[in-house]
Amino acid sequence: MATKKRALSFSEKHQKLVDEKFRKSLNIQVMNKLERQAKNQVVQNENDEKVERQRFLRVLQNEQFELDMEEAIQKAEANKMLRDRQLEQEERLANELARLKHESLKDKKMRQQVRENSIELRELEQKLKAAYMNKERAAQIVEKDAMKYEQMKRDAEIERIMMEEHDRLLKEESAKQERRNKERAQYYLDLEKQLEDQERRKQEAYEQLLKEKLMIDEIVRKIYEEDQVERQQKLEKKNAIQKYIEEFQRAQDFWRQKKREEMEEENRKIIEFANIQEQREGERMARVHEIEEKRVQRQNLLMKQLEETLRQRDDLEQVRQELYQEEQAEIIKLKVKEEAELRLRRQREMKQDFEDQMALKELILQAAKEEEETFKKAMLAKFAEDDRIELMNAQKQRMKQLEHKRAVEKLIEERRSQFLADKQRELEELQLQQRRQGCINEIIEEERLRLLKEHAAKLLGYLPKGVFKREDDVDMLGEEFRKAYQKRDGV
């Protein structure tokens, strides 16, 4: 029993092991199957997700394409609208530019017509042209005076060069004469030295002669001592020698006197020559001073003549300018007076025309009223005559008369309205004419100020009287111009 139990237990265990292995194997299979199913499910899910994603992406792409198309259409429409607005703006701008250009051309033409027809502007232009002519004439006069002054300067320069050349030649001649005088003085000095040398040699010869004489005297004395007989002979000989010595001394004295006289004569000639040279130099310097004084006097005379000529010319030009300006001022005054009289006459005429128009209007109104009454009566009579036969009934006749009266009043009202419309149109035309005249006056004033701004500064000092109508015109041109103009006007 126990063995059986043990055997059973073993088989149970074995069976359990087998069952357990089977379960494990089954579990493994199940797990593998589940894993495969899970993998398949995952793959299926991934495929489904991929398909769904692709479908979603296609939907998104389609929606994005639709959005892009819609946005492109909106952009195209917006661009078209923008282009249309731009074209419209460009067209408006072109029209505005054309209008401005047309108005500018119209304004230019109007200004041109105003400039051509305005007496004031023409007179201002004539004054400015006259000022330019005065300026040009003054410039020509200044240029001529400058040319004459330059010619005088050139003449004075030529004269100065000639005087310098003359002075140079005189100095060279004086230097040559001084060299000759020095050479002559040196020659006389050398001659005097030679004479002194000759005198010295003669003195030495004389001393030598005296020595010989002493020797002779000594010999004579010895001879006299030795021989009395011979003494007489020696005495005679001595007398002869003494006579010879005396003759020699006389000859020497005569020669010395002659040399002294020659030297005195030579010194006198030298002194006389020096005096002559000094006198000549004094005369030359006097001539130079005289020539220089004459040149200065001539130059001063020419300068005075030039100054007098320029002064006379300036005075003449000033008188001419004053006369011209007075004539222009008188002409301008006459023109201004004529314009004032013309304006006054026009104002009177306009006033008279207005009064005449008002009187005529009253007459017309009165005549219109009378005509209306006459017309009214005539029409009433006509209507009454026309309807008298047809209207037998008094009530109908009164109604017809009222109808005729209303018709007549309507006609009268229409004629009155037409008359008032005509008068209103005439008044508007008059106001338009006044505005146009005011615009023309503004253009004339603007053109006048423009001409002054453009030309007044260039013509300062040459502007005739009457160019500036008001003090504001001068102030308009600037502080510097005003000061210069007031300074010149004060001068």
Swiss-Prot record:
Main location: nucleus
GO cellular component: axonemal A tubule inner sheath; axonemal microtubule; axoneme; ciliary basal body; cytosol; intermediate filament; nuclear envelope; nuclear speck
Keywords for the protein's UniProt record, in alphabetical order: Cell projection, Cilium, Coiled coil, Cytoplasm, Cytoskeleton, Flagellum, Meiosis, Nucleus, Phosphoprotein
Chain segments annotated as transmembrane: none
Signal peptide positions on this chain: none
Protein family (similarity comment): Belongs to the MNS1 family.
Protein name (database record): Meiosis-specific nuclear structural protein 1
Organism: Mus musculus
